[in-house]
Amino acid sequence: MTPNPTPTQPSRRIAHLDMDAFYASVKLLRYPQLKGLPVVIGGSRRKMDEALQAREAGRDTADIPVDEFPRLRDYVGRGVITTATYPARQFGVGSAMGLMKAAKLCPQAILLPVDFDEVRRFSQQFKQIVTDIAPVMENRGIDEVYIDFTDVPGGQRESGLSLARLIQSSITQATGLTCSIGVAPNKLLAKMASEFKKPNGISIVQPEDLQSRIWPLPCRKINGICLLYTSPSPRDVEESRMPSSA
């Protein structure tokens, strides 16, 4: 008798989903007139924020003129940036940067406080959408998750691209927010891949892509690697690529 063939095990497909500039994007849903402008989110609530809130009374927030919003150049204090829109990032502004330092780089940026209640609400909403489609999810923060595509119907199609598109479009349709997704054989590579095509992108990394797409990246792109080790010598790079003798 001919033995029955051994069933082929599905390739492991892990996705990392990261919401794009999440805190800022939630704010832009309230103030769509700020889309495409440099906007910084951070610091505690200030008098200028209370003044903006007072101007909102009895009017559509989308109708507030852009020139009525607080500007980063007027900030004084020790607060730090929670996040910034992509137009603001083009000036070198980024998360965890002091607001006073950011004001020197992009003084014209609009400065708004975090709306924690809205952020939590949208966080719960996008995660519910994910688990409705792919139930095996690991929560990694308010704006990012890992998802196991391996055994999900459609999770192997196009190496996970089809399922990633479905999740991405479902989130955008329901919330108005965008996300970026990386799909790879493990969590480490998936997280790196989710950064490749931000914002609103999808990247697939296969084992055979390591040499061409992963090796050239600086060490700081590897999650968990010490930021102090960012400039390896050419010799270090070559030795790291040599096969182990063990």
PLM feature segments, named:
Residues 159, 163-218:
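Long, highly charged, low-complexity intrinsically disordered interaction regions
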Residues 1-142, 146:
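Residues that scaffold, gate, or flank divalent-cation-dependent active/transport sites
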Residues 226:
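Short, conserved phosphate/pyrophosphate- and ester-handling motifs at nucleotide-, phospho-/glycolipid
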Residues 142-150, 185-190:
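Short, conserved phosphate-binding/catalytic loop or strand-edge motifs used
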Residues 229-232, 236-246:
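Single conserved hydrophobic/aromatic residue that forms the stacking wall/gate
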Residues 147-165:
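Catalytic palm subdomain of template-directed nucleic-acid polymerases
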